[in-house]
């Protein structure tokens, strides 16, 4: 998979089959769209392409919301690479970009920059300034500028449509089992092991302290969890405790893992 950090850097040699979105979580609903994207690209001898954005648009447009995300940008990139995608564009999202009208976005980005043959979108996709345009507008622009449009229905689990918001809420509520079902894989954290107070060692339960660098990563609620971890490419099991530790300046989040038989 080729990675580009702006659509201006992408120089397509072939026509592209494109999908657009934030893809937070890369959940089973996203996978349904991506599978269709890759299938279409193969059938039409085109390149498959995802256009996503960072920061998340809500971080820019709703600064007070402090949204927490299911994936860091590195985690999302790894998950998308596993799908077999040809190209990933992570375009910087800012207020100037958000002011593009729907037609400006279609003409200047999809047509002129991405050399689009077809766009595949989810059931609730909206775009353009203030997210005013929808599938009907996209079909009209497709007819005007010469590309195809296909909309994918929602992926459902037990008659409930899967969304990143529902997964975030499940994690916040402590329902990791439901979140994992919607994701299609176990929810995970990535970080750096740092030296802690080493109190666990004194009672026979040495722990590793995990530091999460990105403050926008959604951390499950405080509690004890069974975890699988990859250490030096080895899969090990353990118990993870998430809680608050007293510090000089108050309290800080602590993520400690006791690895079993390691």
What do these predicted ranges mean?
Residues 7-72:
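N-terminal catalytic cores of NTP/NDP-binding nucleotidyl/phosphoryl-transfer enzymes
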Residues 99-206, 232:
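Classical nucleotidyltransferase
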Residues 196-262:
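Phosphate/ribose-recognition catalytic cores of enzymes acting on nucleotide-derived substrates
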């Amino acid at each position: 998979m080729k990675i580009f950090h702006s659509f201006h850097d992408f120089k397509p040699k072939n026509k592209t089959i494109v999908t657009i979105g934030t893809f937070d979580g890369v959940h089973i609903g996203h996978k349904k769209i991506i599978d269709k994207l890759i299938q279409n690209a193969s059938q039409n001898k085109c390149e498959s392409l995802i256009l996503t954005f960072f920061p998340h648009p809500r971080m820019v447009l709703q600064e007070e919301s402090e949204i927490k995300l299911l994936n860091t940008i590195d985690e999302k990139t790894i998950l998308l690479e596993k799908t077999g995608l040809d190209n990933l564009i992570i375009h910087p999202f800012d207020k100037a970009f958000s002011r593009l009208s729907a037609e400006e976005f279609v003409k200047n980005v999809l047509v002129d920059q991405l050399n689009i043959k077809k766009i595949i979108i989810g059931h609730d996709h909206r775009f353009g300034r203030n997210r005013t345009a929808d599938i009907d507008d996209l079909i009209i622009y497709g007819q005007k500028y010469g590309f195809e449009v296909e909309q994918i229905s929602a992926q459902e689990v037990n008659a409930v449509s899967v969304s990143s918001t529902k997964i975030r809420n499940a994690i916040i509520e402590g329902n990791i089992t439901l979140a994992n079902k919607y994701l299609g894989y176990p929810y995970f954290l990535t970080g750096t092991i740092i030296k802690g107070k080493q109190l666990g060692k004194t009672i026979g339960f040495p722990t590793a302290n995990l530091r999460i660098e990105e403050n926008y990563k959604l951390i499950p609620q405080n509690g004890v969890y069974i975890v699988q971890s990859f250490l030096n490419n080895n899969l090990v099991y353990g118990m993870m405790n998430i809680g608050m530790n007293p510090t000089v300046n108050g309290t800080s989040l602590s993520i400690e893992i006791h690895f079993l038989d390691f």
